[in-house]
């Protein structure tokens, strides 16, 4: 019998692409870089925040000082706006409810910085109690590395 299921967050339980794109574009624009269409971000996501920003910056990411500025501006914007357009995918709340009814524990492991994970889950799934939910922490490598598990 399955005792626990651990889900990814972005692109699995929730569609967060628009908020990610808007926040990265905010950082790009503030630093004189070209904003990218939201659609492009489908190819930028995966492997965590730093890779997301590097991919959006293109070759400009090699300027360490500029990269750190874009990242800081992104972080500041995303902290306020991470739930503006983000929503759970259809059927996820019901799936989580069915798992809970069967006694299956649920968890979330995300490459998103840890400080955003709980906030987003509480808005999207206010009636579900996750056994464990965590995001990227400095002491662990990002997924697909299994370190955080």
Write out the residue ranges for each language-model feature:
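N-terminal helical cap/lid subdomain that shapes the substrate entry/recognition surface
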Residues: 2-94, 101-102, 113-115
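Substrate-recognition "cap/lid" segment bordering the active-site pocket of phosphatases
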Residues: 84-87, 113-149
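Generic hydrophobic alpha-helical segments
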Residues: 92-96, 148-149
């Amino acid at each position: 019998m399955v005792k626990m299921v651990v889900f990814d967050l972005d692109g699995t339980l929730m569609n967060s692409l628009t908020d990610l794109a808007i926040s990265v574009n905010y950082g790009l624009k503030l630093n004189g870089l070209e904003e990218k269409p939201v659609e492009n971000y489908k190819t930028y996501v995966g492997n965590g925040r730093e890779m997301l920003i590097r991919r959006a910056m293109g070759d400009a990411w090699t300027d360490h000082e500029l990269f750190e500025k874009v990242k800081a501006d992104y972080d500041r914007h995303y902290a306020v706006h991470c739930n503006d357009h983000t929503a759970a995918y259809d059927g996820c709340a019901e799936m989580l409810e069915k798992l809970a009814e069967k006694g299956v524990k649920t968890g979330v492991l995300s490459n998103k910085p840890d400080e955003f994970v709980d906030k987003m889950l509480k808005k999207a799934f206010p009636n579900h109690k996750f056994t464990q939910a965590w995001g990227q922490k400095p002491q662990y490598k990002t997924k697909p590395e299994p370190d955080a598990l």
